[in-house]
């Protein structure tokens, strides 16, 4: 990793992004909270309106039947979004762990519609080409997001959207998750000021993601006649303390080289067109009167 070209991004005061919209697109309940919970809280604090989109139905996680797991993850997904401050949630319900078999055209088309309908400026999601990605839901989502970001601004793709009042939309920039070791990243985001919201979101990931590990440990110790002062006197305190102490180690390590308490990593893509092209500059310098 070329550390010379890594930019450190910190919270900007005064809500400089007020009026802008971002969409965080993840596959599973716990993806965004772990991989970008701090960034999403930061963007909202800076004035963005955020929308959370989950592509899978999470039927494989939750400890119950497929139907029970789907419902449990759906309910917890809304709580995760509320903990960060998202305005709304969209669940697309593709079959968990089998998204490599779905129609990418279908997923891409739904994402294009949402980007246009919500007037999205910034997208946060997976790196479609990230190394070591084993989960088919992750790379299927990442690829569809990448394609949708490009096609969203093409008026001849899904022209019925335009006729229905949802104009083509150019995505301005993207933050790609650092989801696996050795995936590329060029931006380190200081999430220290937003760590409490990240913790709150992870705590809501109880069907999967370890949000209730603290209360479970507290209950096991109580049966043995023991307690950990760290876990406090109630289940909610136990869950938050457990997340803070044991589930944030990666984010501490990401911040250490930059003297940050907590950080998240991303591969950032700036898709904004330059304000002035070389053609504009050439015309200004060389145009003569007729």
Task: List the model feature ranges, each with a label.
Residues 61-64, 99-101, 131-134, 184-187:
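A generic structural signal for short coil/turn motifs at secondary-structure boundaries
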Residues 2-9, 13-18, 154-167, 181-290:
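C-terminal accessory domains and tails appended to enzymatic cores
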Residues 42, 144, 148, 201:
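Hydrophobic/aromatic ligand-binding patch that stacks against planar heteroaromatic rings
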Residues 58-59, 130, 180-182, 194:
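Short, solvent-exposed loop/turn segments at secondary-structure junctions
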Residues 1-118:
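Active-site rim/loop-helix segments in enzyme catalytic domains that contact anionic ligands
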Residues 67-71, 139, 192:
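Short, conserved loop/turn and helix-capping segments at secondary-structure boundaries
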Residues 26-28, 135-138, 205:
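Histidine-centered active-site/metal-ligand motif
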Residues 51, 78-80, 87-177:
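Internal alpha/beta domain cores that form substrate/cofactor-binding pockets in large enzymes
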């Amino acid at each position: 990793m070329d550390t010379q070209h890594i930019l450190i991004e910190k919270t900007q005061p005064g809500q400089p992004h007020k009026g802008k919209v971002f969409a965080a697109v993840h596959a599973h309940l716990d993806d965004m909270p772990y991989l970008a919970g701090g960034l999403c809280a930061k963007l909202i604090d800076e004035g963005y309106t955020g929308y959370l989109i989950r592509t899978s139905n999470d039927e494989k996680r939750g400890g119950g039947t497929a139907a029970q797991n789907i419902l449990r993850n759906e309910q917890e997904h809304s709580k995760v979004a509320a903990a960060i401050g998202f305005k709304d949630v969209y669940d697309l319900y593709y079959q968990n762990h089998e998204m490599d078999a779905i129609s990418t055209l279908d997923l891409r088309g739904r994402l294009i519609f949402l980007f246009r309908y919500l007037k999205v400026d910034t997208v946060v999601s997976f790196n479609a080409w990230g190394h070591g990605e084993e989960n088919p839901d992750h790379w299927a989502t990442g690829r569809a997001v990448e394609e949708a970001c490009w096609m969203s601004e093409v008026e001849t793709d899904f022209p019925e959207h335009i006729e229905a009042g949802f104009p083509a939309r150019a995505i301005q920039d993207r933050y790609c998750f650092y989801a696996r070791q050795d995936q590329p990243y060029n931006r380190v985001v200081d999430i220290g000021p937003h760590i409490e919201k990240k913790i709150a979101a992870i705590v809501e990931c109880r069907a999967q993601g370890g949000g209730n590990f603290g209360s479970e440990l507290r209950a096991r110790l109580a049966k043995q006649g023991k307690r950990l002062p760290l876990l406090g006197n109630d289940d909610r305190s136990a869950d938050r303390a457990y997340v803070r102490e044991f589930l944030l180690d990666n984010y501490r390590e990401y911040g250490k080289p930059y003297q940050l308490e907590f950080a998240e990593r991303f591969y950032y893509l700036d898709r904004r067109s330059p304000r002035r092209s070389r053609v504009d500059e050439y015309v200004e310098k060389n145009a003569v009167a007729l």
